[in-house]
Amino acid sequence: MTETHAFVEISSRSAAELAEKYLTLWNEPDADRRRRMIAELWREDGRHILQPPQEMRAIAAQPGIALTAILEARGYEEIGARATSAYEHWVGSEGLSFRGRDDLDRLGDVVKFHWEAVAKDGEVFAVGLNFLVLAADGRIERDYTFVVA
């Protein structure tokens, strides 16, 4: 009897290509190209869930502060707005770029990798960890992003 699995099997090479395309999105200056990349990478009902740095979470946890410590974008429009905002602030204004670290891994339908936000002089400004949960069609269903340093 053959057992059917609900998750997509992807090769290490295609996992690396997915992570590379994902990071390229956050560095992309053209808004139309970002929109097309989002449609290629995410399902239409996909989610991008971001845990911001500890400093932001501490502020959000204070009494009387109407912020959430977890930021979530659902669907192409919200993910596009998130990508545009990130590009305008971190890449456009701050001059940073996003690059992957050499630690990509996959397990079933999950791809895991670290990334860095790097200044033009090579200084690492921030480090993040992503878990991409893939749908059966290979596109991102849920994207969990942790800013770890």
Predicted ranges, named:
Residues 1-149:
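C-terminal and inter-domain tail/linker signature
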